[in-house]
């Protein structure tokens, strides 16, 4: 795996499809994708000449995500992580999105052909195991405009808009309203309690990765259950210099949402490769009226907000964050018999 991420050459069985060990490495990286409350709402099928991605409706958060928008976004992030991992290992992905109209859960089929990895592929793949969702306060250092421009250019390749939020006071008010609305929603709170503040679980948000929400922060955080992560010393949330970025699409159908997830992946990995801390923000987009307010504030009639992202520089005294858990590949990947024999 180290050689692959360092770009020292593709590991392949032949010129048509990667061998079993390469596929395993690819999917190990793919499932490191962030997802709403770390539900990991995906499953994979390995076929003789392709990889198939499916959503898991049983992992949909019915109160937090009633129409399944964030489920599709999460799977889009995993899809792009897979594409990046393949490229770093010497395989160009050919993605067919929603290939089966009769199966709404079948989100993508990924074919491959040989590819010589470039440095960008290698850098993005190397960022996958290093990326963390860092909900803590960031330092006061600003994010360079050129860095944001690169993220926007990469998102645009997939037809997704990235805009920096300039009116932070108004955005803070929108987010605070979403937090307030959720506090009075008993079903939402029950769901949040189930999926956060966890210890020793293979899914959900661990307590060790949750700081307490601070209302003085430029953008208030979600009120997770049982937060167990301390803020860095001598860091005031009010001085947080993070940039707030919004990803939006021209339409709001399932394809647009999947593409937005893919764009979120490339922005998060680009930020990580630059040494930036990052954190998706989805709470204000989970309620119709606050999502409409974000749309009016950032995109107007020209786009639908799909995800907000907080990007900035972690304080120099911030402790490294542990990785969040993932299910074993055996729980989320279906292997064909011939590749199972290769693994034995």
UniProtKB/Swiss-Prot annotation:
Binding sites annotated in the UniProt record for FMN: 40-44, 326
GO cellular component, one term: cytosol
Listed cofactors: FMN
Keywords from the named record: Flavoprotein, FMN, NAD, NADP, Oxidoreductase, Virulence
GO molecular function: oxidoreductase activity
TM regions (residue ranges): none
Entry-linked SUPFAM superfamilies: FMN-dependent nitroreductase-like
Up-regulation conditions: A member of the dormancy regulon. Induced in response to reduced oxygen tension (hypoxia), low levels of nitric oxide (NO) and carbon monoxide (CO). It is hoped that this regulon will give insight into the latent, or dormant phase of infection.
Applications reported: This protein serves as an immunogenic antigen, inducing gamma-interferon responses in whole-blood cultures from M.tuberculosis-exposed adults in Uganda, and The Gambia but not from South Africa, indicating this might be a good vaccine candidate.
Zinc-finger listed as a keyword: no
Subunit details: Interacts with human TLR2.
Family recorded in the similarity comment: Belongs to the nitroreductase family.
PANTHER family xref list: NAD(P)H NITROREDUCTASE RV3131-RELATED (PTHR23026:SF123), NADPH NITROREDUCTASE (PTHR23026)
Function: Stimulates pro-inflammatory cytokine expression via TLR2 signaling pathway. Activation of TLR2 results in the phosphorylation and activation of NF-kappa-B. Also induces TLR2 expression. May influence the innate immune responses to facilitate the survival of M.tuberculosis in the granulomatous microenvironment.
Note: Was identified as a high-confidence drug target.
Name of the protein in question: Putative NAD(P)H nitroreductase Rv3131
Source taxonomy: Bacteria, Bacillati, Actinomycetota, Actinomycetes, Mycobacteriales
